[in-house]
Amino acid sequence: VPTICIARQEKADIAALARARGWNDIVVKPTIGGGGYRTYRFPLDELPRYSGEIEQTLADRGVLVQPFLPEILNGELSLLFFDGVYSHAALKRPKAGDYRVQFQYGGTNENVEVGEDLVAQARACIVHAPALPVYARVDGVVKDGKFLLMELEVFEPLMFLSRHPEAPGRFARAVRDRLPK
């Protein structure tokens, strides 16, 4: 997903940056956060209504600005990798009338089988990390058959381990294999 990164305490004209890219409906979220914390979606002309919250977020962390993709309404895919090896996937869906997929906003999740093409596209996102993470959750949506990365979660992501019987063992082996011998 095209993304504008705004660093902590940086002054940026979000409206001008978004307009230059042709975005009319945007999502603004912290670079570090979880559970939809301080995530806002709004039409660009409503930016003044959210500017105070965005400034508060920028006081102690950066933000990501992305175009709102209506594909999220059909669900966000989470593909889990342990030491670079695909393990399993979940589909997170928002409740009717919302865009947030987190359970605290009424979102649900379910096991899902994904094709090798999506696994390969999600795996390609991991190779851009500075080092291969022991675990990663690759979140995104599918548009026209293409996986669009929304977030690469590598710090304590929800991994849906209880929903896949083999996943806890895969995760444990990946961690064990990284420990000094």
Model-derived regions, located:
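A conserved helix-loop-beta module that forms one wall/lid of the active-site cleft
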Residues: 1-39
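ATP-dependent carboxylate activation and anion-phosphoryl transfer catalytic cores
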Residues: 98-99, 113-181
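Phosphate-binding site of ATP-dependent enzymes
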Residues: 22, 35-126, 130, 141, ...
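A short linear hydrophobic-aromatic micro-motif
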Residues: 2, 25-28, 63-67, 134-139
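Generic hydrophobic alpha-helical segments
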Residues: 14-18, 53-54, 122, 175
